[in-house]
């Protein structure tokens, strides 16, 4: 219990510090999500130890932070409290049920609104004129920013309409539109000044600027969302109708304020806004739900920090907090070892997340990760989930360091540090490593490889485990009889797979090269190799120096290619595959090595009379001519058409010889 008490006190200090940075200095060091998590964690622990520890001065019982010394302090007419946050349906349901169960009214209405991501402001009007503008501060007194607020055009300086009260206290949010935020950072970049990390910081910094003219130039926007005090005796009891009245007096009000009378209605509004927010020109981080009746609000009252009659239902479907339980190591098809965090299962956007890739060991060091840490996981759209940052270090128990493995977790081979900058570790066993072999088979049969329909990763793994496939060439020895022995594969599916295998036997040289999964050799590099060698035999008998002559191949790829073709294990597989496949050249026309332009780099400039640009490029490639898109010193010729552009000017600077269209056509027509 003593350890927990000490941890609580430490957590209180940490939250106070970050609240001071956020509210007072306007210079937060952690994300809003991380701050919210720390507060929730503190609330949980305080509740657990409520009879043994005093929490009167805890940040869970206070609002905001102290004020900046540059601004004068003024008290609010009524306290300007913050809101309690909920992030999941169950917590919102608890709030809803507590309201409904504690009030003996036939029908309770709630006003659902947007939760703006800006700076809360309290405006005081005397006889319809703006008298003072004060920030939230600690909830009871804030900073006088009247001179700056006077520069914000959307804040009414004089109220319009009828029944204007003698004294009026209005609450709202000052924020920066997304479009204005972009313009501001462009302007700051131009003058080589520090950029704002987000629109909220930009709004807060602009509102608190010592020079009111700067505030005016920053184009801030104001929306009203409530009334703190009104001396008008006949003011309506409905918060929703009060907003309408405030609008008639000249206050800008959001178009997304709705009255709801059920949990389901509010939930539908939440889901709608969750999608709609991406189309808004300002940032929001959730919705706010308030009991509509002012009388009921008063009966429900408040805590020292927040009202009991309102809650902020924040968006958190894309970001969740979970705990790292273990670190696993996956071996890829090229032997790269990828650390994977095994986490406490959570749902994000309807998807159950159990594992999260850490990409490389440098990422572990960057995040300072340990087993037992609580982390923020983000998943946007269909993007693979990733860890944003550590939410909380494991403090109550000893956490384990994550060390770099020395041996392959699959085959036991000694691992090699492939890249010190990103700390990439590789297993050099190649296809002798079962995991690499399976992953290569997945790739070999995939759309990027030979595109064998029906042979997915699960079936391939079963075929390997049953001993039916022990190298790449065994795929082409499969038959219906063997396939039907595999679980969940019937005769029709087997026949379809065999048909697809037979279709894949006719393959281009570049496609074949790409399917082999040679490290750093993708479709573009494979095509360059194919255009240079034309045949598999020439490729298998080439030297490292010859690889370096190919466009787009540097020392690393040349080493990978040379090591691959000189490995006896690989040689044997290539030999077997060449006997079972019909590997055709990507160059369909007959190649004449006496062709002036054979294996020469050319670039086109201008338009051509006899062929379209795409057609003339296609013909050139068929003749073994290397076509590039831009001019560089390595280009051998520039082919000049009508109205050539800047490429010709650049080519002349490099003294690149030019060939006009007619002459070029005479050269290639001989071979067509």
From Swiss-Prot:
InterPro entries: BRCT_dom, BRCT_dom_sf, DisA/LigA_HHH, DNA_ligase, DNA_ligase_AS, DNA_ligase_CS, DNAligase_adenylation, DNAligase_N. Transmembrane segments: none annotated. One of its GO terms (molecular function) is DNA ligase (NAD+) activity. NAD(+) binds at residues 32-36, 82-83, 113, 136, 173, 290, 314. SMART domains: BRCT (SM00292), LIGANc (SM00532). Keywords: DNA damage, DNA repair, DNA replication, Ligase, Magnesium, Manganese, Metal-binding, NAD, Zinc. SUPFAM superfamilies: BRCT domain, DNA ligase/mRNA capping enzyme, catalytic domain, Nucleic acid-binding proteins, RuvA domain 2-like. Its EC number is 6.5.1.2. This is DNA ligase. Zn(2+) binds at residues 408, 411, 427, 433. Belongs to the NAD-dependent DNA ligase family. LigA subfamily. One of its GO terms (biological process) is DNA repair. It comes from Buchnera aphidicola subsp. Baizongia pistaciae (strain Bp). Residues 592-672 form the BRCT domain. DNA ligase that catalyzes the formation of phosphodiester linkages between 5'-phosphoryl and 3'-hydroxyl groups in double-stranded DNA using NAD as a coenzyme and as the energy source for the reaction. It is essential for DNA replication and repair of damaged DNA. It catalyses: NAD(+) + (deoxyribonucleotide)n-3'-hydroxyl + 5'-phospho-(deoxyribonucleotide)m = (deoxyribonucleotide)n+m + AMP + beta-nicotinamide D-nucleotide. It is an enzyme of class 6 (ligase). Its cofactor is Mg(2+); Mn(2+).
């Amino acid at each position: 219990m003593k350890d927990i008490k000490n941890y609580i006190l430490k957590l209180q200090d940490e939250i106070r510090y970050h609240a001071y940075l956020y509210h007072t200095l306007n210079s937060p060091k952690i994300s809003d999500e991380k701050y919210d998590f720390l507060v929730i964690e503190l609330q949980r622990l305080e509740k657990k130890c409520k009879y043994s520890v005093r929490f009167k001065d805890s940040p869970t019982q206070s609002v905001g932070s102290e004020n900046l010394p540059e601004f004068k302090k003024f008290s609010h007419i009524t306290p300007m409290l913050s809101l309690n946050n909920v992030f999941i349906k169950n917590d919102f349901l608890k709030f809803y049920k507590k309201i409904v169960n504690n009030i003996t009214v036939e029908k309770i209405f709630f006003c659902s609104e947007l939760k703006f991501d800006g700076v809360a402001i309290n405006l005081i009007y005397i006889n319809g004129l703006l008298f003072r503008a004060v920030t939230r501060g600690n909830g009871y007194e804030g900073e006088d920013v009247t001179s700056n607020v006077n520069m914000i055009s959307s804040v009414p300086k004089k109220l319009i309409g009828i029944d204007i009260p003698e004294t009026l206290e209005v609450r709202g949010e000052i924020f920066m539109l997304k479009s204005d935020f972009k313009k501001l950072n462009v302007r700051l970049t131009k003058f080589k000044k520090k950029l704002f990390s987000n629109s909220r910081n930009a709004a807060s910094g602009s509102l608190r600027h010592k020079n009111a003219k700067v505030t005016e130039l920053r184009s801030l926007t104001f929306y009203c969302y409530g009334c703190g005090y009104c001396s008008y005796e006949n003011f309506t009891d409905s918060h929703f109708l009060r907003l309408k009245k405030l609008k008639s007096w000249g206050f800008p009000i959001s178009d997304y304020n709705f009255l709801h009378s059920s949990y389901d209605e509010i939930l539908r509004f939440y889901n709608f806004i969750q999608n709609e927010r991406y189309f808004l020109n300002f940032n929001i981080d959730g919705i706010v739900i308030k009991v509509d009746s002012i009388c009921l609000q008063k009966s429900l009252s408040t805590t020292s920090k927040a009202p009991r009659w309102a809650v902020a239902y924040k968006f958190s479907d894309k970001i969740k907090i979970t705990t790292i339980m273990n670190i696993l190591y996956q071996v890829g098809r090229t032997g790269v070892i990828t650390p994977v965090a095994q986490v406490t299962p959570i749902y994000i956007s309807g998807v159950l997340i159990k594992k999260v890739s850490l990409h490389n060991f440098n990422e572990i060091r960057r995040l300072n990760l340990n087993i037992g840490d609580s982390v923020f996981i983000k998943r946007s759209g269909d993007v693979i989930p990733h860890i944003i940052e550590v939410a909380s270090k494991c403090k109550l128990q000893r956490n384990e360091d994550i060390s770099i493995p020395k041996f392959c977790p699959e085959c036991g081979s000694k691992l090699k540090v492939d890249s010190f900058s990103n700390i990439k570790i590789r297993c050099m066993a190649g296809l002798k490593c079962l995991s690499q072999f399976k992953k290569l088979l997945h790739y070999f049969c995939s759309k990027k490889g030979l595109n064998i329909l029906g042979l997915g990763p699960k079936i391939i793994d079963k075929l390997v485990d049953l001993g039916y496939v022990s190298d790449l060439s065994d795929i082409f020895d499969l038959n219906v009889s063997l396939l039907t022995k595999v679980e969940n594969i019937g005769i029709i599916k087997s026949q379809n797979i065999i048909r697809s295998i037979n279709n894949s036997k006719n393959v281009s040289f570049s496609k074949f090269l790409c399917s082999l999964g040679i490290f750093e050799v993708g479709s573009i590099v494979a095509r360059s190799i194919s255009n240079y060698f034309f045949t598999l035999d020439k490729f298998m008998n080439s030297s490292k120096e010859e690889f370096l002559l190919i466009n787009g191949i540097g020392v690393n790829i040349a080493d990978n290619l040379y090591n691959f073709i000189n490995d006896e294990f690989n040689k044997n597989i290539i030999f077997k595959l060449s006997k079972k496949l019909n590997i055709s050249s990507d160059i369909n026309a007959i190649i004449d090595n006496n062709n002036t332009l054979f294996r020469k780099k050319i670039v086109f400039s201008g338009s051509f009379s006899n062929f379209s640009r795409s057609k003339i490029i296609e013909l050139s490639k068929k003749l073994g001519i290397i076509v590039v898109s831009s001019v560089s010193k390595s280009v051998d010729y520039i082919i000049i058409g009508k109205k050539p552009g800047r490429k010709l000017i650049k080519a002349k600077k490099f003294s690149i010889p030019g060939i006009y269209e007619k002459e070029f056509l005479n050269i290639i027509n001989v071979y067509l």
